[in-house]
């Protein structure tokens, strides 16, 4: 009857299966590609204590992600935002540029489609895959290389690769990779942004 849908959603929101399933998905997406039972339990407990309060659930996810030492693969879109922010680059159209033509500023739709992760493209009902193996083809990696190059050339990055590495405490394998990439800053920038560490992969 009237109000039945609200009762159903309230029931499902605090159901144990819901808590367990969504906590595991959140842990896999934000904490680790293979989250531990303790990671999932931490989020589950926050869910129960807060009776499904999303602020508390999200806080628990962030806390666990900060504490985690496990590599977390970055989705193409997440990686792109990370690259732009680390370099303090200007790559997308902002509010003031929406109706202006500037061939150095990319349209969001074109960018996401090229990355293979567009809001507007048909996709599976359960969203994009959280399995990193789905995103690790040579083609998908080559796209990241091209985007890193485009951000360097057109995005006017304000932070050098060496400063970025110092800020994030880059490991020795990443520093060695960047050093071997070449003598020019654009080569170092691409190597850093497409390194295993910044893509959220274990270093070989």
Regions found by a protein language model. Name each.
Residues 1-15:
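Short, functional "switch" segments adjacent to catalytic/cofactor/reactive centers
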Residues 15, 19, 23-50, 55-204:
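Flexible, low-complexity segments enriched for small/polar residues
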């Amino acid at each position: 009857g009237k109000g039945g849908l609200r009762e159903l959603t309230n029931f499902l929101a605090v159901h144990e299966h819901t808590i367990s399933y969504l906590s595991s998905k959140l842990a896999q997406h934000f904490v680790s590609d293979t989250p531990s039972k303790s990671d999932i339990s931490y989020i589950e407990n926050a869910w129960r204590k807060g009776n499904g309060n999303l602020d508390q659930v999200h806080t628990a996810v962030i806390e666990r992600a900060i504490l985690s030492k496990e590599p977390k693969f970055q989705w193409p879109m997440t990686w792109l935002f990370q690259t732009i922010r680390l370099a303090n680059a200007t790559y997308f159209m902002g509010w003031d540029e929406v109706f202006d033509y500037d061939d150095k500023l990319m349209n969001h739709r074109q960018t996401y489609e090229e990355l293979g992760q567009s809001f507007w493209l048909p996709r599976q009902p359960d969203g994009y895959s959280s399995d990193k193996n789905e995103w690790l083809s040579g083609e998908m990696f080559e796209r990241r290389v091209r985007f890193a190059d485009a951000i360097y050339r057109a995005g006017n990055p304000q932070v050098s690769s060496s400063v970025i590495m110092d800020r994030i405490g880059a490991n020795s394998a990443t520093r060695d990779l960047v050093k071997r990439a070449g003598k020019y800053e654009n080569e170092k920038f691409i190597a850093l942004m497409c390194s295993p560490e910044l893509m959220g992969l274990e270093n070989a």
